Amino acid sequence: MAPTRVTHPPDDGRGEHFRVRIEGFGVGTWDLDLKTWALDWSDTARTLLGIGQDQPASYDLFLSRLEPDDRERVESAIKRVSERGGGFDVSFRVAGTSNAGQWIRARAGLIRDEAGTARHLSGIFLDIDEEKQVEGALRTRETHLRSILHTIPDAMIVIDGHGIIQLFSTAAERLFGWSELEAIGQNVNILMPEPDRSRHDSYISRYRTTSDPHIIGIGRIVTGKRRDGTTFPMHLSIGEMQSGGEPYFTGFVRDLTEHQQTQARLQELQSELVHVSRLSAMGEMASALAHELNQPLAAISNYMKGSRRLLAGSSDPNTPKVESALDRAAEQALRAGQIIRRLRDFVARGESEKRVESLSKLIEEAGALGLAGAREQNVQLRFSLDPGADLVLADRVQIQQVLVNLFRNALEAMAQSQRRELVVTNTPAADDMIEVEVSDTGSGFQDDVIPNLFQTFFTTKDTGMGVGLSISRSIIEAHGGRMWAESNASGGATFRFTLPAADEN
């Protein structure tokens, strides 16, 4: 192909007229002689480069006005175009003048002679400083947004209307095991197990056809799939947006694995507490029954024996039968007493498994069970726990049973109170003990009630059985501690108990 021949048009005044017009728009013009490297530029070009009108134009002067980091790049571009042809389009920053740091864009084309030899590089200078500032602001904003995405604990994934991943946050990388570069461009169904993986494209297609809004903005629990093939429960919320007339969907994903493990642990803990509570209640009731019934049963047996002696001299032909019946009745009365004692002994045989436990951990776990719904009841919870009085020697389940009982009693006592505050503290006590205090702002109780609070079957509640506090005190005393209660001067009640302090070793 023959080289393009471009020559300067004849000077009929129209070229100068055009030059003046574009100069009026802040566009500088310039012309570089590729043989002599002589440079000619307009007044606007001088202004853009920060060069005075009295300074002679030169190629070296032009290069000296560029930032050092840009100078070599611009010079290489000019050399490349002059030798190989093509277009010239570079941006650079002005240095060493009042315009220092200002961005200029240079665009030019080659002018060839009739033989096709490049003679001149002629073009324009454009002020693009404002454009660069906008670009910089956009980059800063993008960096800022990416930094935010890096710190968001929940995974964020953006897909287009065809299910193709467009954005994959750092949290998503950690959660699913795919890097951002690997995930972008793939179908989002790689993050799903079957059958959702095969069906997801049809889900999107149906939504785009029907615009059914039930999937947008509503969180739900689904199953996710990691790169290694393992699955996990996750909470998914989806939002929709439009960009360029095309729909995009943003998914916010939270891993529920730890949450479900915690829930399972709480359910297990609750089951343990329920089991121990039932055994404790049985033991307390068996002890009370043994104490209350043994005397009348013994009296029945004695009366039976006395009645038999009265019949000893009787001539009634049925006397032997009556004596036999009285003997059997006396035996059954004694047997009933033995059954109650055996039941009490059986329940009481459960040995405590005392270990070194963290009191703060016991209180936290017991609070998750005993204080469920407290916030909904507008109860202020304040745990003021001393780390220096944290380790105790205790049976975890039994002490949590005591705490749960106290917490639930406190919530019930504050149900009708205007001010609802529950405070739990722990402090070192004498004789290597640690004292735990549970204080509420409920209805409290009269001083004459206090001596009976811990008696079996005594209750101040309409529906109470009266065994909870009795069991709690028995547990604490079995640990070598003691338990007592006081009325608060400002209303409410405070329960205290002590436990043996433990050593880390």
Curated annotation (Swiss-Prot):
The modification Phosphohistidine is found at H291. GO terms for molecular function: ATP binding; histidine phosphotransfer kinase activity; metal ion binding; phosphorelay sensor kinase activity. Keywords: ATP-binding, Heme, Iron, Kinase, Metal-binding, Nitrogen fixation, Nucleotide-binding, Phosphoprotein, Repeat, Transferase, Two-component regulatory system. It comes from the Bacteria. Residues 288-503 form the Histidine kinase domain. It catalyses: ATP + protein L-histidine = ADP + protein N-phospho-L-histidine. InterPro entries: HATPase_C_sf, His_kinase_dom, HisK_dim/P_dom, HisK_dim/P_sf, PAC, PAS, PAS-assoc_C, PAS-like_dom_sf. The heme moiety regulates the kinase activity. GO terms for cellular component: plasma membrane. Its cofactor is heme. Transmembrane segments: none annotated. This is Sensor protein FixL. It comes from Bradyrhizobium diazoefficiens (strain JCM 10833 / BCRC 13528 / IAM 13628 / NBRC 14792 / USDA 110). The lineage of its organism: Bacteria, Pseudomonadati, Pseudomonadota, Alphaproteobacteria, Hyphomicrobiales.
